[in-house]
């Protein structure tokens, strides 16, 4: 699946207040995705892939230099919006025309594992060239999510509980098992994803599985009558 589909998922989840509908949206997304894309999506939603490739401040500076716009004006817009990724995506809409569709269907996996990491290893001039190319070759509707991923500021109003329940229903696995498997680091690899949705419990998982919790109740009978 592509960045376009992930951006639609972001929009659908962000605009929906119903827990049950968010769960259904996620389940449908998982069914329509490849395992590797699901792994990357889960990692992003849980905030485990929020690596900063370029800072928000540098993103604004680069936009200013690439499109010859006064930085002071961009900074004023930033104070009103409060988010570098969002203000830059809004301003970009007035300056971009897709030159080609080479990145139109780029996968989330390729984006966060291959393309964006290159930004960290380039000097500033080459960073600007690559960033401009990326901006020019993705649909405008994807710019907000793209910039949030670039700046490591991707957040969405979906709790870990909703994500856990969605995976549990999607994979038909007990929710407590999914919750345990999501603990700690979760690198978005095919191997980790296959472990996450594996229906068989391993011995060490059973050993650490918590007992069901129940509140204590008062005992109102005489012990000899018990």
Q: Positions of the model-derived regions?
A:
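N-terminal nucleic-acid-engaging modules of covalent nucleotidyltransferase systems
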Residues: 1-226
